[in-house]
Amino acid sequence: MTTGFLQKIFGSRNQRLVKQYQKTVETINALETQIEQLTDDQLRGKTDEFRQRVAAGESLDKLLPEAFAVCREASRRVLKMRHFDVQLIGGMVLHYGKIAEMRTGEGKTLVATLPVYLNALAGRGVHVVTVNDYLAQRDAEWMARLYNFLGLSVGINLSGMEHEQKQQAYASDITYGTNNEFGFDYLRDNMVYETEARVQRALNFAVVDEVDSILIDEARTPLIISGQAEDHTELYVRMNALPPLLERQIGEEKADGTGVEKPGDYTLDEKSRQVFLTESGHEKAERLLAEWGLIGEGESLYAPQNITLMHHVYAALRAHTLFYKDQHYVVQNGEVVIVDEFTGRLMAGRRWSDGLHQAVEAKEHVKIQSENQTLASITFQNYFRMYAKLAGMTGTADTEAYEFNEIYGLETVVIPTNRPPKRIDKQDQIYKTAKERYDAVIRDIRECYERGQPVLVGTTSIENSELLSHLLKQAGLPHEVLNAKQHEREAAIVAEAGRPKRITIATNMAGRGTDIVLGGNAEKQAAFIEADEAIPADEKARRIKQLHDEWETLHEQVKAAGGLHIIGTERHESRRIDNQLRGRAGRQGDPGSSRFYLSLDDPLLRIFAGDRVRSIMDRLKMPEGEAIEAGIVTRSIESAQRKVEARNFDIRKQLLEYDDVSNDQRKVIYQQRNELLEAHDITETISAMRHGVITEVVRQFVPEGSIEEQWDVPELEEALRNDWQLDLAIQEMVNESSSITADEILDAVTTAADEQYEAKVAMVGRESFSAFERSVMLQTVDRLWREHLAALDHLRQGIHLRGYAQKNPKQEYKREAFELFAAMLDAIKQEVTRIVMNVQIQSPEQLEEAAEQIEERSGHLENVEYQHADYAESGAPVANVAAATAATATADMVGSAMTHGHGGELPKVGRNDPCPCGSGKKYKQCHGKLS
């Protein structure tokens, strides 16, 4: 109550910010007359003037009014588009590293030009991030005219580009690309063996378009570069026979033994999408597997030798009970293709992990492809948090404002519309069954069609869009279906979705990024006429005028019919996705309307609100075909959506907390990897490693401060001879001296190791040997880091079980992850020292050959896949990765390498700073020991 009272007096935080930015808008507008009088050359010359002022120490904030005024004037001259005042406010929000929520049709692409131009003046690069290649290319080509006019270079970063093209794109002042491509380039840069092979610069400033889609919807899905693993095809086929023989248990057993309606072998948790074997299920599975010869008679599934089988049992169960054809995946050309649950898009090239994809392939009786091992991976949460400054734009961010602030430290500012919105959002209509719902949808579409009103129908899945298309065909209503398979065709259809009588069915976010203009898109057709060289100039002008006149008539006709009508056939579990669908209507003050049609069979209603609404319908004795349309029901649904959103936020936050553990370790490893790449001479590092390893070996047999009776000299001699190529007569030294100490033995062994090392260096020369050492070190760090991440992954999969032992799983994970990391650092030192001390070299040529073999072995990318939503594997630049990066590994290099690493991009850890691993020690006394 107090908050509401204070808001009335002082306004909300959002209103105060907008008011504050409005003052700067007035300053920019005051400069307009002065800037308008400049010639094109003088306007272009402003860019050089600004650059010099920035180089002299002037801040970008101080430069903002002038830079925005120049950019607006250039846009007016080049693009024939002048930024509105609210667009200037949007530009300021982005420049100050916040999220701008702008309604559909308010010109987000144009808004981005203001902060992008201003920040590009610093010369450190600006990334404009979009959701697909089509939008990246469209926006880059469209806005490049403006940036080039102002003297700035523009690059496009697309999948499938050559290595040199990528380097050129990143060297530009402004780089357009997709979130996936920026992330994958980052990972590939972390797998290089030469600094020249990198493509990215330091991560400076990113403007993310459709920021909610990238930073929230896709936050739970990491980018993964993977290679082929061991083949378990036969096992998946045999396990596929198990789920049909098991029965589902209905009801959960309570403490008093009640609650089970029907006993069975497994239980399903639809909310968390998990399946669990019951006690009887375990016994039945063990009996069946023993009959099939997969485990020994009377053996438990949890016996050490059978633990891997459990993984296959659960993968098969999940494939049969939680993943459905035409809802979660489709079978296309003999392959299982995932359907994105948020967008309804087919995601060719993306595969489920943990053997689930292979289990689904076995279920559908298609060819089972080999399991993959992760070679490199990063989440968008950790990638985008590495930019020095991050900003985003979307039509719907306010519902997720808390998460943006909590996870990314980004404030959301709602930008006022240029014209007041006129869209009418009608109340939801809820029917008992899906059939009644679809009948009502068809009736509504027919009414719109008859009065010439365009309709956009949003569905949550491909299956539903095809069902609706079938019903519309039966009703004799012509329509277009968008299943989000081809972005360019998608954009063309969506652009024409505002024509009279046009019916368009689209999965939730198909065609996002393209405006629906009432009356159709005359500009595109005019561009085709303009580009046709066969048409004379006067004829072109006549045709374009005729086109615009026709559009004007159609535009008014559609406005009179009520504008674009949006129909939602189901509520999404996120209010934001529903708002995105609604937001397609009523752009820039146009009329429009929206309505959602629901049924009690919808997953959201069934799981969260079904019983309550059904009891209301039963009490009201609703006849068949009659709908409930009441505020209380709509509020009940929104309450259910809020519950789901809160649960999803908790999941994402928890994932991030776990991922932060490996992320902190990454910072250490990749900082050291970069220092290795950039160091001219790593002799000191190798020497420190050698001394550390030799000390450990000697102390194992001759403990510090011990007496002769406690020593095991023969074993020490054998260990040094077999493992370290050091043939020393230590027993003779002990026999000859009555007062020799443990420290003197250590000194003798260390001196011998140093002499052996120096002899090898003298044989081939310091430069050649350093190159060999660097290759050994990089290959060893990469391989053991991947194995470490695989170990972390296995640790994480079972860590929740510690909760049953009254232990905090997160704390346990941090503790054990730290122990694993310390063990990995020791293993790196041991491995590198062993290779360097054991290598037998006669000439520099031999050494060069050995270094090449190491790099070739680690640089051989076999059957590499790039996995993430919307990232087609066929477009991934596999060949040029192998050529350009000479990195990564074959299948014998297990595990994964997460995150980035260019010297300037990860925060430097000072020697006396606290170690990022969380041990509480200084970095130099903890993980800094490696370097």
Curated annotation (Swiss-Prot):
Catalytic EC class: translocase
E.C. number: 7.4.2.8
Entry keywords, A to Z: ATP-binding, Cell inner membrane, Cell membrane, Cytoplasm, Membrane, Metal-binding, Nucleotide-binding, Protein transport, Translocase, Translocation, Transport, Zinc
Positions with a binding annotation for Zn(2+): C915, C917, C926, H927
CDD domains: DEXDc_SecA, SF2_C_secA
UniProt-listed GO biological process terms: intracellular protein transmembrane transport; protein import; protein targeting; protein transport by the Sec complex
Details of cofactor binding: May bind 1 zinc ion per subunit.
Pfam families, per database record: P-loop_SecA, SEC-C, SecA_DEAD, SecA_PP_bind, SecA_SW
Xref: PANTHER family: CHLOROPLAST PROTEIN-TRANSPORTING ATPASE, SECA INNER MEMBRANE COMPONENT OF SEC PROTEIN SECRETION SYSTEM
Name the record gives this protein: Protein translocase subunit SecA
